[in-house]
A protein has these predicted regions:
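Hydrophobic core positions of alpha-helical segments in small-molecule transporters
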Residues: 13, 41, 78, 105-106, ...
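Alpha-helical transmembrane segments of compact multi-pass small-molecule transporters, enriched
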Residues: 45-49, 105-119, 134-135, 195-199, ...
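Non-cytosolic membrane-interface motifs at loop->transmembrane helix junctions
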Residues: 37, 101-105, 159-160, 218
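Juxtamembrane helix-start motifs in multi-pass secondary transporters
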Residues: 38, 185-189, 248
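Glycine-/small-residue-enriched transmembrane alpha-helix faces in small-molecule transporters
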Residues: 1-41, 151-178, 198
Length: 259
């Protein structure tokens, strides 16, 4: 299988997994889970499981990455500006509006990534890239709203958090590209999530949160942590390293279909 084909498949699967994550997150928030607590839970548990996997399977590579100061500086930026802010902003956007509106706003992101890539490389976008961008954003809009504008009832807070989610989503895609090529997606995602989760813990209220658990809550937590976080983030960033940030951000627009 070619590199492009493999990256395309990984990114599409990640987008589908993210759709489940958004649905699970919306269910948990309507059943008493605050946004910060939910963000903290998924970062800590997913990060711990990924780091544990690396300890058991490739401890030497994990230790080498942790000792590399340049890598850890980039990883810290990725953890705070990409993982932490993006997960919080997306869930906050859902909370302030709805899953469809939040998804449409977040997928303004590919436009920004294309603009950044063209400016960085000093090249103009191709006709194919522009058409793909229009089709992806337009398709996301139609899927999320069924073509009915009245389903996009955006409050000022919902608009802010949705656009902020798009910005942080771009950072999440762009910052770790070189890290993943060097150290692998599992190491980068695992340590990044652990760092972000630890930083958030004193401020999220998770230590004071009163858990009300049921089988449905367990299933929703499994959906958002195992499928929507560990699987989705790892596959997406690996796919991005293979097909590039512009194509991966367009392919991930399959998310609303699964949601």
């Amino acid at each position: 299988m070619s590199k492009i084909a493999k990256g395309t498949i990984l990114t599409l699967v990640a987008g589908i997994a993210w759709g489940l994550s958004g649905t699970s997150g919306q269910y948990l928030m309507t059943h008493g889970f605050p946004v910060l607590v939910l963000t903290n839970i998924r970062l800590l548990i997913a990060g711990f499981l990924l780091v544990l996997y690396m300890v058991l399977t490739n401890r030497r590579k994990l230790v080498e990455m942790l000792k590399d100061q340049k890598a850890m500086m980039s990883l810290t930026l990725f953890a705070l500006l990409g993982l932490l802010l993006n997960q919080f902003a997306y869930l906050k956007s859902i909370y302030e509006s709805n899953a469809g509106t939040a998804t449409v706003l977040q997928y303004v992101c590919p436009v920004g990534i294309l603009a950044y890539t063209c400016l960085k490389d000093c090249v103009a976008p191709t006709v194919t890239e522009v058409l793909s961008m229009m089709l992806a954003v337009g398709g996301t809009f139609l899927i999320a709203t069924h073509g009915q504008l009245n389903q996009l009832s955006v409050t000022p807070a919902g608009l802010f958090w949705g656009l902020f989610a798009a910005f942080t989503y771009a950072l999440y895609i762009l910052i770790p590209i070189q890290l993943i090529k060097t150290w692998g997606s599992i190491s980068v995602i695992g340590v990044g999530m652990m760092l972000a989760g630890i930083v958030l813990t004193p401020f999220s209220g998770i230590l004071r949160f009163h858990w009300q658990l049921s089988m449905k809550v367990y299933l929703a937590l499994a959906g958002i942590i195992l499928v929507g976080t560990i699987l989705a983030y790892t596959l997406f960033l690996k796919g991005t390293s293979l097909v590039g940030p512009v194509k991966s951000s367009l392919l991930a627009a399959v998310e609303p279909i699964s949601a």
